[in-house]
């Protein structure tokens, strides 16, 4: 082994500079952050050759006291903290005291600064970490710093620099992030003597977004905010029209600091999941204000990453805020169409074991449900009534399928649903008045029988609730024009034209049904003919061990088969015929990286695919009653506006929109 040597100060400074100063944009970032901490309201950045030849920062901040000018360039010299405890209370951009020392050790640096209480300022010039001179000078209040010939004394770093154009682009990007983070500060970027970027410091975030991007983006934004005890989440998300194929238009700011965070990005993108198409990424500018003691900003040399005390709670707060904002925007767009006061909506979330106030046309019939007579999760296999339950059949108890039943109705197949019961005594004990009420209700209008909705929330319950879904005013001012190309449904309502994609709409109805089954725990498993054996890494196996219940509740039957090997015997029937190993590993990956514990989330894509395959297709001819049924089912949904893959289920044209198209109005 070689002898251990103590490195001299110059060498250690150059090594430290390599961590803090990667490229010219790193210099701009550190110096502009110093200007912001100094309270500057106007900051000018001048660069030449992508910052490799010259970087000049001029601000009107508080300035540096003459006595501190020399100390400012010493390693770990800072005015921001006094002890290690202060790091966890930090509210400024910088705090380590490394930037100026690192920059001056690998460049030629000149700094001039003056505070308001002095009539003159100080100027210092440092070359390669050595002070060449320190003198009095005349200058404005604030600080001007010039960094030239970056890495001139570190040839190994110099040859790895990118092109001037690439570095200029990186500097422009970081300046744009500053403009977004600080709308109250005016930034001016000058490249080769020409103005490249200019913001006006109006304090309005929308003005900053328009400055950084363009008018189109600034006019397609959705505001959102959520405030908790220790955290506030707010900002703007873009409408689906301005989504992109990359994440370049995404900005995250934690306490005004621009950071990169995979889990925050995942929270926002998951909120957009059912609103965007595959491989599309949302636009967003998100601000997170949190007490400093709940984050650690000292986990990365450039402070571009932060660590949160409770990432799970943070994920939920961000997801909920963004998701509600998107839903609210879409809901507002289709307020006239989805006016749920116009129709009696069946409450599929209410448990049948709860007392329910029966309205005029409602009947409850107690039925003993034997475990052998379960309704299939897709509503396909239903046993016929034996013996005296034939009474229900004879009076014509029929039900068109709903969210809780198979939607074969849309393919012109109307199923008769008979209530299976092997315990005849239960039915015999029913009040005869109930049957007369049912018969009256069903025979009220033989030409247009009312639709009955059936719900079996729990196969162990002793009763089934039958509720009539009777339209009130919904169809009064709605006119079904028909189908276009047997694919799009045309509807006129309140002087607005709605075009519904029948496949996307039905796909969403089915998806919500499948999703509901999983959330309520009614998952039926299918036994595999050949169990699937999967070898896991130690880390993957530990994640599985921590989340056994998740897999069990999702319909998996898994056994340990060796040290880090598992044996899968059963998988959820609802997912059809998946690639078992890929599905299992996808869930495991989500549990590790997305912090998701909801089975509905970790199986989202598989459910969406199944719904897509089961839904009515383009070119399927639908009758008017089938169209009405589809619309009624859409009304029940919390989010009927997009299919699970993010495509819109419907679009709207107002009378004004059409008259503009035909040049009737301007």
Swiss-Prot record:
Belongs to the DNA mismatch repair MutL/HexB family. It comes from Clostridium botulinum (strain Okra / Type B1). The keyword Ribonucleoprotein does not apply. It comes from the Bacteria. This protein is involved in the repair of mismatches in DNA. It is required for dam-dependent methyl-directed DNA mismatch repair. May act as a 'molecular matchmaker', a protein that promotes the formation of a stable complex between two or more DNA-binding proteins in an ATP-dependent manner without itself being part of a final effector complex. InterPro entries: DNA_mismatch_repair_CS, DNA_mismatch_repair_MutL, DNA_mismatch_S5_2-like, HATPase_C_sf, MutL/Mlh/PMS, MutL/Mlh/Pms-like, MutL_C, MutL_C_dimsub. This is DNA mismatch repair protein MutL. Keywords: DNA damage, DNA repair. GO terms for molecular function: ATP binding; ATP hydrolysis activity; ATP-dependent DNA damage sensor activity; mismatched DNA binding. One of its GO terms (cellular component) is mismatch repair complex. Pfam families: DNA_mis_repair, HATPase_c_3, MutL_C. One of its GO terms (biological process) is mismatch repair. Transmembrane segments: none annotated. The keyword Glycosyltransferase does not apply.
